[in-house]
Regions:
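Outer-membrane beta-barrel translocator/channel fold
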Residues: 92-128, 134-145
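Short loop/turn motifs that connect adjacent beta-strands in outer-membrane beta-barrel proteins
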Residues: 47, 51-57, 79-86, 123, ...
Length: 274
């Protein structure tokens, strides 16, 4: 033990010294990368000031939170000038009626307690599929490496309104079995009898029964890009959608059906430039 003590006295400071060197080396590496990034951005700004396109293409994934639902959008862009980018996009989402109210339910089967919920009076899930073209114009933040670049986006798309029948799980008053039903003239009484409703139907029901209604959609937005000189695209977008369909879109019973829909949205955008 006495022989080990001097060895420990020697090794402990050596270990501390090695750890300090590792930390200093890691800090130096981070500083070097920051400096390289700064120099690259300065070079890109200089190229842009000379009129050169610093990137040719971009793509982004947008997660949109609407005032009446949600959507996911994939977007591709081609830079035309420093300030102008041509865009095309494909989006899919779901629209919900503002009068929808979710009703919780509790039931039992085989000795198990099942907690579920449903929307009373809902007859269709309303999905939207859009293929669009547009343009993105830089309106603020040019040459500002520390700030936010602001762009105006506008365009239009052909739209398909997809109506999927909304299924409920109900207790059959005759057989006592659990049935999954959609709203029809034949099932109207069961569908609206809240006392016999167990919960919503299976997510797999109704996809092969969808009705497609054509339409079109207009899009305007402001995009706040937090790294326009970076290869990684990260932005927040706020905008408006106006959609029109060729037929009324039934969603809830005893609620007027509409062809025209208007909403606002906030979007988180992530992507890449090259």
């Amino acid at each position: 033990m006495k022989r080990l003590f001097p060895l420990l006295i020697f090794l402990i400071p050596l270990s501390v010294f090695a750890q300090n060197k590792d930390r200093e080396s890691a800090a130096a590496e981070k500083a070097r990368k920051r400096q390289e990034k700064k120099e690259k951005i300065n070079q890109l700004i200089k190229q842009e000031e000379e009129g050169a396109l610093i990137y040719q293409k971009q793509h982004a994934y947008n997660f949109n939170f609407h005032t009446d639902g949600w959507s996911f959008l994939f977007e591709k862009g081609k830079y035309k000038t420093i300030k102008k980018t041509s865009l095309w996009w494909l989006s899919f989402g779901e629209r919900k009626h503002p009068k929808e109210e979710r009703v919780p339910t509790v039931s039992s089967t085989g000795g198990l307690l099942i907690v579920s919920s449903y929307i009373y009076g809902k007859i269709n899930n309303f999905y939207s599929l859009n293929l669009g073209l547009g343009e993105q114009r830089l309106i603020g933040g040019k040459g500002n490496k520390n700030g936010v670049a602001v762009s105006f986006i506008y365009g239009g798309s052909v739209a398909a309104g997809l109506l999927r029948p909304y299924y409920l799980e109900v207790l059959n008053p005759t057989t006592g079995a659990r049935d999954e039903i959609k709203y029809t003239d034949a099932t109207k009484n069961q569908f609206l009898d809240a006392g016999n409703i167990i919960g919503k139907g299976s997510l797999t029901k109704g996809w092969n029964e969808m009705t497609v209604v054509p339409g079109f959609q207009a899009r305007t937005a402001l995009r706040f890009d937090y790294g326009r000189y970076n290869e990684i695209l990260s932005a927040i977008e706020v905008g408006l959608h106006a959609s029109y369909y060729t037929k009324p879109m039934p969603m809830l019973l005893d609620v007027p059906e509409k062809k025209f829909f208007f909403n606002a949205y906030v979007s988180l955008s992530f992507g890449k430039r090259k």
